[in-house]
Amino acid sequence: MRSNNNNPLTRDEILSRYFPQYRPAVTASQGLSGGSCIIAHDTHRIVLRRHHDPDAPPAHFLRHHRALSQLPASLAPRALFYTPGWMAVEYLHGVVNSALPDADELAALLYHLHQQPHFGWRIALSPLLAQYWSCCDPARRTPFWLRRLKQLQKNGEPRPLRLAPLHMDVHGDNIVLTSAGLRLIDWEYAGDGDIALELAAVWVEDERQHRQLADAYAARARIDARQLWRQIRLWHPWVIMLKAGWFEYRWRQTGEQQFIRLADETWRQLRMKG
């Protein structure tokens, strides 16, 4: 279902106009952010998501909806409704664990995603990193950040090993163990890109866990494990800068202390590695 209304509506207007029998049930839950909430009618639940990034064009939010509309139920929740500024998404019943699944299970899930048809838009990190620099708190801009940014821009993004649709925000809180298996939620950063970029961006605990995931994926995808790991390492500087920039970006938007702490820790990691 899609609305033709061109003006963003408030949450209460969305509920009264399109979901009159539903009431807010849970807010700020796992996998939800920026004013999104769960609405319920009796035992039936729906996730109501709001376009919460003022610096992102509306087209980015529409892409999120299109990605969910395109993906099979074996990977993601169904998209149910869209109007400018809002979408409604199927609520997945299951268990969310902050820890990642074991390497074989996660590799199978990601390989299944990467076998799907392309979304139709590419993930480009260089302009995204530049946006994070320009939109961050000016007091947080450092010569070190600028040097690293310019070095990456000079080198250019690695040549893709294999293009596929990517999720790009894989961590424990975005994986739901349902009765039918693992599913991914929170697809707002999805797009087409290198499979090694996806694997580089997974929020792993340490290099050992990362290597286990890479090896499990290589076996499933029939890719040389050493070649895949080399490609993942080529993407690593980009991913670390992406995370640092995103934390800075969210700090400027929200003022929440967790983001500044995460940004500081990521910058420390970058400085230690030179």
UniProtKB/Swiss-Prot annotation:
Q: What keywords appear on the UniProt entry? A: ATP-binding, Kinase, Nucleotide-binding, Transferase
EC class: transferase
Enzyme nomenclature, EC number: 2.7.1.89
Q: Which GO terms describe its biological process?
A: thiamine diphosphate biosynthetic process; thiamine metabolic process
InterPro entries registered for this protein in UniProt: Aminoglycoside_PTrfase (IPR002575), Kinase-like_dom_sf (IPR011009), Thiamine_kinase (IPR014093)
Q: What one GO molecular function would you report for this record?
A: ATP binding
Q: In which pathway does it act?
A: Cofactor biosynthesis; thiamine diphosphate biosynthesis; thiamine phosphate from thiamine: step 1/1
Catalytic activity field:
thiamine + ATP = thiamine phosphate + ADP + H(+)
Q: Which family does the record assign?
A: Belongs to the thiamine kinase family.
Which HAMAP family does the UniProt entry name for this protein? Thiamine_kinase
Q: Which NCBIfam families match?
A: PRK10271.1, ycfN_thiK
What is the purpose of this protein?
A: Catalyzes the ATP-dependent phosphorylation of thiamine to thiamine phosphate. Is involved in thiamine salvage.
Name recorded for this polypeptide:
Thiamine kinase
Please give the organism.
Salmonella paratyphi A (strain AKU_12601)
